[in-house]
Amino acid sequence: MKTVQFCFLFCCWKAICCNSCELTNITIAIENEECHFCISINTTWCAGYCYTRDLVFKDPATPNIQTTCTFKELVYETVRVPGCAHHADSLYTYPVATQCHCGKCDSDSTDCTTQGLGPDYCSFSEMKE
């Protein structure tokens, strides 16, 4: 019985104290409306788990702020989209996370939805490698 209690307490400690929010490599689809196709690029973003809770009885006077794994610092990189027409602006700037933390989701710069389109979504039918 003591082993079960120890395992339970250890798992609770691990979940609370050891958030695994860290940098990870992802592939995103970038698209340019003037070029009418998408290309895939590799970048770095934040992923992992953060301690959070969802109360059964919600108090309207107390805001329920959920933490999420999000960037603490980021830089922007620019890539030239190949194959665009000469008159088109073929430069695309995208964010690259350099440091992560568990914090409130900032909807001004991040898709804070529960289930978004995903980083590899392309609104055009053509995807170039």
UniProtKB/Swiss-Prot annotation:
A GO cellular-component term linked to this record: extracellular space
SMART domains named among the record's database cross-references: GHB
CDD domains to which the protein is assigned, alphabetical: GHB_like
Intrachain disulfide bonds: C21-C69, C35-C84, C38-C122, C46-C100, C50-C102, C105-C112
GO molecular function, one term: follicle-stimulating hormone activity
Organism field: Saimiri boliviensis boliviensis
Cited Pfam families: Cys_knot (PF00007)
Subunit structure, interactors included: Heterodimer. The active follitropin is a heterodimer composed of an alpha chain/CGA shared with other hormones and a unique beta chain/FSHB shown here.
First and last residue of the signal peptide: 1-20
Name of the protein described by the UniProt record: Follitropin subunit beta
Lineage: superkingdom: Eukaryota
GO biological process: follicle-stimulating hormone signaling pathway; G protein-coupled receptor signaling pathway; positive regulation of bone resorption; positive regulation of gene expression; positive regulation of steroid biosynthetic process; regulation of osteoclast differentiation; regulation of signaling receptor activity; Sertoli cell proliferation
